[in-house]
UniProtKB/Swiss-Prot annotation:
The lineage of its organism: Eukaryota, Fungi, Dikarya, Ascomycota, Saccharomycotina. It is found in: Membrane. One of its GO terms (cellular component) is membrane. The keyword Membrane applies. Keywords: Membrane, Transmembrane, Transmembrane helix. It comes from Saccharomyces cerevisiae (strain ATCC 204508 / S288c) (Baker's yeast). It is a multi-pass membrane protein. The chain crosses the membrane at residues 228-248, 279-299, 349-369, 388-408. This is Uncharacterized protein YMR187C.
Length: 431
């Protein structure tokens, strides 16, 4: 009887690297030619080939060269193989497409896209020559230059992949959304976003009294015209327009942010006391401020301490930008995974919705525990107000969970950078 591994060996493809002539089974360490030729090459061999090619091009005299003269070439190779290199990119390609449409009208090979990304890297570096990889070799058989896929090195991490996909999505969606919505009618868009966020957290009866209006559906009608927006009471407009700014600065401890939050919450408190007689909004504001205070001075400080230790351990593997030697240039939480304006804006817009979903899960868990252990307790508020409390708790829980995920993603990113560094060093030095 034929053993099963005999059929498996027939399925597995055997390859010969045309550089080192080594034969083995095709796996993730190989690169297949995309030019149509039946050729394969090791990732390490391809990187070593590129390294030697650029050393001969930029460093022809290797006798009197200073130490680390090839560091720019090695840095470019690290960026080339980094499967998550967009973590360190400080601009959105969508912004470029909107100003230079030709980038969106043709398929750009990885070499051109890579050079385009590297140009932004070296515009801010002062300690290395501003050159990038200019040659990527050619197929020995058909002589095509665009003959191979981009070699990448990554680690298996679902959390890191989640953050990478989230950053890529926001990089395209937010700039396009701002162009199509904010630039066409920024006032209406800001009003709609603020009202939608308030509806995610507060029930209808609370919003009716807080915003001094018979029904919030009327606000949708008012928002259709400029005259309708002007007819909305000033206090209500401030609450709606300022809500997203309040969320953006809720954990900010700067003087301007504290002043803005104090003024905004004073307006909300005054409106709540004047028009709403249900559950006390001042108590909700007080507890929210206490929770924010505890978050800033306990959890956030603990997270920053962990980030500092992570930077001290893995900061040497960071190859991008000019901030690796200055820890004050960027926040500690952005040292390994940069957050751009579009990612921050998307987080603040979706935060109330995520908090509402999280609060719903917490409420269901609370009711299940109450039924499971037969706890006799009735809250002194309406069901919609009780749900509002859990929505606010859900926002805090979502913020803590998101910060924890970012910390873990930074930890995995540090491991990935270490793996990339070892791969390039071993490939270039021939180890």
């Amino acid at each position: 009887m034929t053993p099963p591994h005999f059929f498996l060996s027939l399925i597995k493809k055997r390859c010969i690297c045309w550089i080192c002539l080594e034969e083995s089974t095709y796996d993730s360490t190989w690169l297949q030619h995309t030019c149509g030729c039946n050729l394969q090459i090791h990732k390490r061999c391809y990187i070593r080939w590129l390294y030697q090619m650029h050393v001969e091009l930029f460093l022809p005299n290797t006798v009197d060269l200073p130490k680390d003269a090839d560091l720019p070439i090695i840095t470019c190779l690290k960026c080339l193989v980094d499967g998550h290199h967009d973590f360190m990119t400080t601009f959105s390609l969508t912004e470029i497409w909107e100003t230079r449409p030709i980038w969106g009208q043709k398929s750009v090979p990885f070499q051109n896209d890579y050079v385009f990304n590297l140009m932004s890297l070296y515009t801010k570096r002062d300690n290395h020559p501003p050159y990038v990889l200019v040659k990527f070799g050619e197929c020995p058989q058909c002589k095509k230059t665009n003959f191979i896929k981009r070699p990448t090195v990554t680690i298996q991490s679902s959390v890191l992949s989640l953050f990478y996909q989230w950053q890529k999505i926001t990089r395209y969606v937010i700039p396009l959304g701002i162009t199509s919505l904010f630039l066409l009618n920024p006032e209406k868009t800001s009003f709609d976003i603020g009202l939608w966020q308030l509806r995610c957290l507060f029930p209808e009866n609370v919003l009716r009294n807080m915003l001094n209006i018979s029904t919030t559906k009327a606000l949708d009608v008012y928002a259709q015209t400029e005259r309708g927006l002007l007819s909305i009471p000033l206090t209500s407009s401030i609450i709606i327009y300022g809500f997203i700014h309040y969320l953006s600065n809720i954990s900010n401890v700067s003087a301007n942010a504290i002043l803005f939050k104090w003024v905004y919450l004073s307006i909300v408190k005054t409106a709540g006391n004047k028009y709403y007689k249900g559950i006390g909004l001042p108590k909700i504001i007080l507890y929210s401020n206490l929770a924010t205070f505890c978050y800033n001075f306990t959890f956030k400080r603990l997270v920053d301490l962990i980030y500092r230790r992570l930077i001290n351990k893995g900061g040497k593997y960071l190859y991008h930008g000019n901030f690796e030697n200055s820890s004050n240039s960027v926040p500690a939480e952005e040292f390994f995974i940069r957050r751009n304006w579009y990612a921050i804006l998307a987080e603040k817009i979706l935060w109330p919705f995520v908090g509402k979903c999280t609060g719903g899960l917490l409420l269901n868990a609370f009711l299940w525990i109450q039924r499971k252990f037969k706890i006799e307790w009735t809250p002194n508020c309406s069901p919609s107000e009780f749900r509002m409390i859990f929505n606010i708790i859900g926002c805090g829980t979502a913020a803590i969970g998101w910060s924890s995920l970012k910390l873990y993603a930074s930890y995995k990113r540090c491991q990935e950078l270490e793996k990339i560094n070892e791969f390039i060093e071993q490939s270039c030095k021939g180890e």
